[in-house]
Amino acid sequence: MTRSPIPLEYPAMDARAALPAYSPQSIAPTSAAPTSAEAPVVALNGFARRFGDVTVIEGLDLTIQPGEFVALLGRSGSGKTTLLRTLAGLDSAEGQDVQVPAARAVVFQDARLLPWKKVWRNVALGLRGGDIRNRAQDALREVGLGHRLDAWPLTLSGGEAQRVALARALVREPSLLLLDEPFAALDALTRLRMHDLVLNLWRAHRCAVLMVTHDVDEAVALADRILVLDGGRIAAEERITIPRGQRAELTQPLRQKLLGILGGTDAAVDERVIRFPQASYPQAGSHHAAPLQVAGA
């Protein structure tokens, strides 16, 4: 069945193009997350992962409902990627109580496209049956790249490459979509466009989503539920019942709360004052400039 294109237009990325100022209101409201009465798509009970003498995850319990959008926050080394790799089937979960759907797909920070295959063939990797090219084309049209069907990956921008990776994941109609910091390498403009695209794709396909991110604002804007992983355990859980598009008043207090759990401070970089040393400019011909001093560094 051919799926109607997502109602977003994505011409070639141009930083000079006019774009409305981003705010949570730019994301259209959506229905509430599925109720817990439904059978979960993901269920982990007492999950643990050790590498030698190092325990990365210990006694983790996690459920994700069909159609739920979950964001996973955590500091580096907290076990986020380890958990995602297990759910993706990249690491064995033998002997543990881990239930995941057979139909699942993952999108990484690096789009991981094969440069020797045209875009549509990257999307069609592993597909079986007839009309593979047409199915790939439909998926590319969904992400606004139907015109790049026969392009080579090296001719794509970073945002275009990530959209191809999304098309490759969703053409398989997964029950679970795993996103491992998929926007981290993108510029701010492209990142915001990708937020809207991912939400629209999620609404169209209604798969469950687990998104690993370091960006608290991104998690608040996109997710139904936010988890904080610390020391291999779920340290905090925030369920957001306010519809997308009405979260402006929620963003600031929730950001402060989550950053406090993560051990950070709100807008830490913005609050630091850059001070230039006075009367210490290098003389003409000197190659030794006075060091830049940053308060609180």
List each model region and its residues.
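Conserved structural motif at the start of ABC-family nucleotide-binding domains
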Residues: V42, I57-G59
